[in-house]
Regions:
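Structured, solvent-exposed acidic/aromatic patches
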Residues: 1-193, 210-217
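C-terminal functional modules
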Residues: 188-306
Length: 306
């Protein structure tokens, strides 16, 4: 490169000994992510992309692309603004029942990093319904901190990606099980857990790579979905791509007592075009919508083939 780095303008890697080398790893990790998104649509192209990138991706948490925030406005964690308002003046931020039940069933050691306890337990509310705020877990203080960083790409995601690439038959370093174990361990430690807790967790038959499921997409997809907590768009993409964990559509959801579920609802798999596109570019918007099967939240993107 023409220079050793971008100096203090580089908010991700300026503190590293070799910032450009870190950016190269970030670029390759991003290629791995994009290659996997293509894998069911175009396996040959995905294989080429992933095998070219796999040898120089993230190798530890030190490589994380972590965007820093400060304690000073306006440069603080944007989640903290809403979160702290919710904790003081609003009562509509609680943990969802599905993720709480899933993590409770697995005795997941990341729960203290994700959520608060209520009466000595982690309790989730019904998503989208009226819930009594005091009776359910809320987000952990760590997430609501003004200086809690935003992960753009992290080591666990990369390790899960390498595990999947190996299971797909692509040539990457290491074994799928090694990468899976590395990913789960790193995720647990990031959220405040220990190596010992990770080892105990990975020894569970419902977590272990070889016994949790015969379907690698379920094994990797479930744990990757949990590891992507607080990264909604990426976890949504992974769920659409791998179809795990198995989420119930709203029409099949169980409602709290005295409430009901509207009929005909499904889980969105895309965002519709914004209203200004419909208003200012109506003809082309209609043309594009027709080409993809309709401007609907149920229209799958081109790579979502399963």
């Amino acid at each position: 490169p023409a220079a050793a780095g971008f100096g203090t303008a580089d908010l991700l890697y300026s503190s590293k000994a070799a910032p450009i080398a870190n950016w190269v790893k970030f670029g390759n990790a991003l290629k791995l992510r994009l290659g996997l998104i293509l894998a069911d649509k175009d396996p040959a192209k995905a294989k080429t992309i992933i095998e070219a990138a796999a040898a120089n991706v993230f190798t530890s948490e030190a490589d994380n692309a972590s965007f820093p925030y400060t304690l000073s406005t306006p440069n603080n964690n944007p989640i903290s603004t809403n979160a702290n308002k919710a904790l003081t003046t609003r009562t509509d931020y609680i943990a969802a029942k599905f993720i709480i039940d899933k993590m409770n069933a697995l005795e997941d050691p990341r729960r203290p990093g994700f959520f608060t306890m209520v009466g000595g337990a982690y309790i989730g509310g019904y998503y989208g319904f009226s819930n009594s705020y005091a009776n359910f877990s809320t987000m952990a203080p760590k997430i609501a901190a003004y200086d809690f960083p935003a992960l753009l790409m992290d080591y666990p995601e990369t390790e899960f990606g390498l595990a999947e690439a190996g299971k797909r038959g692509f040539t990457v370093p290491g074994t799928p099980e090694q990468h899976y174990n590395n990913a789960v361990t790193a995720s647990i430690k990031y959220w405040g857990g220990t190596d010992a807790q990770a080892a105990t967790y990975l020894a569970r038959p419902d977590v272990a790579f070889t016994t949790a499921s015969a379907n690698y997409k379920e094994v990797i997809g479930t744990q990757k979905w949990l590891a992507l907590y607080n990264r909604g768009y990426e976890s949504w993409t992974e769920w659409r791509r791998l179809d795990f964990p198995a989420l119930a559509p709203p029409s099949a959801a169980t409602a709290p007592a005295g409430q009901s579920v509207p009929a005909g609802l499904s889980i969105p798999v895309r965002l519709i075009y914004p209203i200004n596109e419909q208003t200012l570019n109506g003809a082309k918007r209609a043309e594009a919508a027709a080409a993809i099967g309709g401007d609907l939240v149920t229209t799958k993107l081109f790579w979502d083939v399963n």
